[in-house]
Design a protein with these regions (language model features):
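Noncatalytic carbohydrate-binding groove/subsite architecture in carbohydrate-active enzymes
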Residues: 1-2, 22-164
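Asp-box/WD-like beta-propeller blade repeats and closely related beta-sheet repeat scaffolds
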Residues: 6, 18-21
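Active-site neighborhood of divalent metal-dependent phosphoester/pyrophosphate hydrolases
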Residues: 6-12
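A short acidic, helix-capping loop that chelates divalent metal ions and anchors anionic groups
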Residues: 13-16, 93-95
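A non-catalytic structural micro-motif
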Residues: 45-46, 181-187
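Substrate-gating cap/lid alpha-helix
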Residues: 165-173
C-alpha cells in the first residue's frame, strides 16, 4: 500500500457516525488519530485527506469550502507530508467552464470542475499549503445515455451529457490536471 485516503466525503452527514461534532474540527480529531497510526506503521506512505463532496450547506451537508476552512482552523496546516483529496465534480459543465449561468445545474461554483480546483488551491494557499499536492480521488461526468426512462427531477442535468461528452471531458480534465503544479494522481 503506497497511499491511504482518510475517509470519504466527511462533509456529508450520511458519512458521519458517532459523537464527534459534524464539522471540520471533528474530522481533524479523526484525521489526527489516523495520521499518527499510519505514521507509526510507515514514515513514507502518502496520507490523503478525505475528499470533500462539492456541496453547499443543507440539512445533510456542510459546504465543502467551509468544511476545508474549518479543517485548517483545527490544524490541517500543521501537516506538511500529506496530500489533499478533492472531488471536483462538474455536473453538466465542461471541465474548463466556470460559474455561473441560469439553468439550475450551472448556477453554483460547486458545479464546476475548474472552480472547484481554483477554490481549493486558493484556500490551501491562504493557509500556507500552496505546495501541497491535490489528489483528485473522485471526478467524472454522469450521463443518462443508454438508460430507459428519465432520471429523477434533481438529476435532469444528466440528459445534457452524452457518452461523447463524458469521454472527452474526462480526457480534458486529465489534461488540465497535468498542466497544474502540485496536482497528484487523478482517479
Amino acid at each position: 500500500v503506497d497511499a491511504v485516503e482518510v475517509w470519504n466525503e466527511p462533509n456529508l452527514v450520511r458519512e458521519w457516525v458517532g459523537t464527534i461534532p459534524f464539522n471540520g474540527a471533528g474530522y481533524m480529531q479523526l484525521f489526527d488519530a489516523a495520521y499518527a497510526a499510519i505514521r507509526a506503521h510507515s514514515p513514507s506512505m502518502t496520507i490523503v485527506v478525505g475528499g470533500l463532496a462539492p456541496t453547499g450547506d443543507t440539512a445533510g451537508s456542510i459546504d465543502d469550502r467551509t468544511f476545508l476552512r474549518q479543517m485548517y482552523a483545527a490544524g490541517l496546516g500543521n501537516y506538511r507530508d500529506i496530500a489533499l483529496g478533492i472531488h471536483p465534480y462538474s455536473w453538466a459543465n465542461a471541465p474548463e467552464a466556470v460559474c455561473c449561468g441560469t439553468a439550475g445545474w450551472d448556477d453554483d461554483p460547486h458545479f464546476f470542475f475548474a472552480d472547484n480546483l481554483r477554490d481549493y488551491r486558493q484556500i490551501m494557499s491562504e493557509n500556507g499549503h500552496a505546495e501541497l499536492p491535490m489528489w483528485v480521488t473522485e471526478f467524472g461526468w454522469a450521463t443518462w445515455d443508454g438508460f430507459p426512462g428519465q432520471p429523477q427531477q434533481d438529476s435532469q442535468w444528466m440528459l445534457r451529457v452524452n457518452q461523447w461528452d463524458q469521454a472527452n471531458w474526462t480526457i480534458r480534465a486529465f489534461q488540465i490536471g497535468q498542466q497544474m503544479p502540485n496536482m497528484g494522481p487523478m482517479f
